[in-house]
Amino acid sequence: MIPTDSEYYTVVKFALDQCEQFDHYLEAWKVCEKKFWQYNWIHAYPNAAIEVIALYYCENSLDRCINMMSMMGQDVDCNAAQVATMFGAAYGIEAISEKWLKPLPEELLTYVRGHEKTSIADITSFTVECVNRALENR
């Protein structure tokens, strides 16, 4: 599905080739990390490699996949979201552990000065307020 003449294809193929050469996911990642060192931690290329590697080694377990992606680092939350979506589409909701399906607690503790203790509802309201103000001022 990925055009074979694209850069993205070469990244995915490189990661898959490493998976086929090594018995452990961290060995495959070490080679990919070295190859993609020049890219920022949120760049698509190292994160695509992480997703490929984790999916290859996780034995169809989302929990294992998320754990592996966390151990490799980079943009962990975005990688987990993309892979969880793939698991849900491919295997159904039954493939996703209940702990990932439960609602988050309302209270949030942060490192943001002045907002060390907040809530999802407060953040949601503030976001809507900002969007409405931006729309009014355009």
Model-derived features: positions:
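Bulky hydrophobic segments
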Residues: 131, 135-138
